[in-house]
Each structure stands twice: as structure tokens, then as C-alpha cells.
Amino acid sequence: RTIDCLKLLSQKYKIGITINKAYTNEEINQINEVVDKVIKEKITNNMPPKEKIKIIHNYIIDNTQYDKLKYEDKNDKTYKSNTAYGVLIEGYGTCNGYADAMAIFLDKLNIINYKISNEKHIWNLVYLDGSWYHLDLTWDDPISDININRDIYFLITTEKLEELNDGTHNFDKTIYTEA
């Protein structure tokens, strides 16, 4: 749904603002139901934040399959895999969907985070114990049929991310100064 707003600044100029909602109200309700249920069932108040993040990390990658069709054809409409809805409701995701889903959980858990991106990829940046860490569920989710949780990209420093040098995690450090 698109909402158009026009504001008259003077007799000569008008500025038009278009706001595109990423989710319908029904989708937001469904996402919140899943997030609230997972937090209620798997997270306790006395858990350290890192443990909470690991539980959510594993939940998402255990319940999501990487959407190869969307990766190969950006116009594929089979799943909404580039959104948290695709990840949490449909069970299919691409990097944007994984990052959005994780950000929603982190926000609900009051853990400071950003999504960090470049032309090719998007992942999460998480503030924990006074430092910033990278968190990439897309690259931690094994594409094979084997259900093995990886944590190569679980709360790693920028230095470690640069050591991995996979070519997809380059970012502008003048924009993401926290990293």
C-alpha cells in the first residue's frame, strides 16, 4: 500500500512524499505472533544477551531454507523471501529476509542493531557488551540438505570479517562508523 502526502511549503513549491509499506497489517500481525511465541518459548529474562542471540540465530536458520529461485531471478514471486515474512511465515529467505527477521527479534529483545549492506548483500550489526559485531544468518545457514548449524559469521568483529575475505561483506566504513 502506498500513502501519498503533499505539503505546501510556499506558493511556489510542493514536495511529494511517497511511503511504501513493506508489510500489510495482517503480515505484521503474523510476524509478531511468531516472534512473540519464539521468545516466550525459548528465551528467559536471565539469559545473557549473547545466548539469546544464538537461540534466535539457530531458530531462524533451522526453520528457513535459502531461496535459490529468488537469488537466480530477482523477479521470482514464489515466496516473499526478501522479507521477514518470507523467512518467518513461508520458511524461505534471501539475505534481506534473514537480516529483517533477525532485526525484528533483536528489537523485541531490546538489543541495539543495524542492518549493514552493500550492492550485493545485507546482514546485521549488533551492539553487545560495549562493542559492535557482525551477524550474518544467510552465510551461516547451510544450503545443503544437512541440518548443520554454522556460526562462522556469528557475532564476529570487523577484523575477523575482513580475514574471511569472501568478497560479499565489503562495506563503507564512513557510513557504518560503528563497525
Predicted features by range, described:
Residues 15-17, 60, 122, 133:
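A broad, low-specificity signal marking well-ordered, structured residues that form hydrophobic/aromatic
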Residues 41-47, 76-77, 81, 146-163:
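Short, exposed beta-strand "edge-strand" segments with a Pro/Gly-rich flavor and a Y/T-containing core
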Residues 96-162:
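Hydrophobic/aromatic-rich core segments of domains that either
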Residues 1-37:
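Linear, non-domain "peripheral" regions
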Residues 84-97:
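A short, highly charged nucleic-acid-interacting micro-segment common to nuclease
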Residues 155-179:
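Leloir-type glycosyltransferase catalytic cores
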Residues 24-87:
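Secondary-structure boundary elements
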